[in-house]
A protein has these predicted regions:
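Active-site anion-handling motifs in enzyme catalytic cores
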Residues: 1-397
């Protein structure tokens, strides 16, 4: 069986690269002839904002580490599918149903395929796609109807989280079309990493805490943030640990740490920095999934989702971050860890410098590693079970 995976694999984003890698590795391990469809994303502006030294690392990974087809765009997708003679196309993972550009959305809902002569020859399945937004209500009715018709022709349907399923079911389908929730493939990543960790001799495994903050984090309220980092670093030093910053692709945060991982950072090396850390403190969804895959304690500085409540914002500013857990239903971090026993490993990231560094360290030190292990194992089990069912449907068994 030959499949093509249609996903976000080229952006300057570690998570986007690694979810494609994990999917590719998993299906290949099942004896499936697997390709990443080298689709050029119309809405991808990441190369315009990422640090120059980092761009090549993402592009090389997407084109050399992954098994990719020739580069295609909206006009050449059908020709590629014919040329490759795919039995099926997988859509996802990642936020491929984000409505940044309608033409990209059409690609990832696959209505272009179902409107072609290949609709009865090539099957389509969902592979943990996500929305990562608030609403589809502003999409034209004819576009919604096209997407509904396309989804109803998928051989297998799932979504990465409950929020995606909820919004698609309510605003696109009009009924409970998506019923399965399928974990992110990065849960499986650890078993597929076959490279050695590259690091200076001064940095030892499990003797540092890793932090990742937004670019130019200290530009606003810098005095308070620098004091917070200084206190955090001092407390870690007393415990015999270093503070290492791994910058996001856009650029470093501007904080003072013991070491900053230099660009260019290969996505697999990025994962290994998380795996070898004593704990991870930081932003980004796939950094948290990678922590779970690696068994690394984490504190998510959650900036996802949207909450309009002024009272909520005041509570967050005052340090009452648990309020966010009950209100911010669209946060993909909340959707990820709800029901895991790790809900306290997430706080509103906007005002993290208002949280005591001592409390953060104690929270990380007190995380039960067996809880992480059980949660990871359960997600891996669900992923494999869902994909086994998908393969049966594709094969018509």
């Amino acid at each position: 069986m030959r499949i093509g995976i249609l996903t976000y694999h080229t952006p300057c984003n570690f998570g986007a690269n690694l979810q494609a890698y994990a999917s590719y590795k998993y299906f290949t391990s099942q004896g499936i002839d697997t390709w990443i469809i080298n689709y050029s994303l119309l809405s991808d502006k990441s190369y315009d904002i990422v640090a120059e030294a980092q761009k090549e690392a993402h592009w090389n990974f997407s084109q050399q580490t992954l098994r990719v087809t020739r580069v295609v765009n909206n006009d050449s997708l059908l020709d590629l599918v014919r040329e490759m003679n795919f039995d099926a196309i997988g859509v996802g993972a990642d936020a491929v149903w984000n409505k940044r550009v309608v033409d990209d959305l059409r690609v990832f809902f696959c209505d272009w395929l179902f409107k072609s002569d290949l609709k009865d020859k090539v099957k389509v399945f969902a592979l943990s796609p996500a929305f990562m937004g608030q609403t589809y209500s502003d999409l034209p009715l004819d576009v919604k109807n096209d997407f509904k018709s396309a989804l109803e022709q998928f051989t297998y349907l799932d979504a990465r989280d409950q929020w995606t399923a909820h919004v698609v079911n309510k605003e696109i389908a009009g009924y409970e079309l998506i019923k399965n929730i399928n974990p992110d493939p990065v849960f499986l990543l650890d078993k597929f990493v076959d490279v050695e960790w590259k690091h200076p001799n001064s940095i030892l495994s499990k003797k540092y805490y890793l932090i990742s903050l937004p670019k130019n984090y200290t530009k606003s309220l810098g005095f308070l943030k620098r004091i917070w980092v200084k206190r955090l670093t001092s407390l870690l030093h007393r415990r015999g640990y270093q503070l290492v910053e791994i910058p996001i692709p856009d650029g470093a945060s501007g904080i003072d740490s013991d070491y900053v991982v230099p660009y260019p950072i290969d996505p697999l090396q990025w994962y290994l920095w998380i795996k070898n850390a004593k704990g991870y403190i930081g932003v980004r969804f796939h950094a948290i999934v990678s922590s779970l895959s690696a068994g690394t304690p984490f504190l998510s500085l959650d900036t996802y989702g949207k909450v309009d409540s002024k009272i909520h914002k005041i509570f967050s500013y005052l340090g009452f971050h648990k309020n966010d857990h009950f209100i911010n239903k669209s946060s993909k971090i909340r959707n990820l860890i709800d029901g895991s026993g790790l809900e306290d490993c997430r706080i509103n990231g906007t005002f993290v410098f208002m949280v005591s560094p001592r409390k953060i360290i104690e929270k990380l030190e007190n995380i039960d590693l067996s809880t992480i292990s059980k949660f990871r194992s359960e997600n891996v089990r669900i992923f494999k079970s869902n994909m086994a069912e998908m393969i049966k449907r594709i094969k018509g068994i």
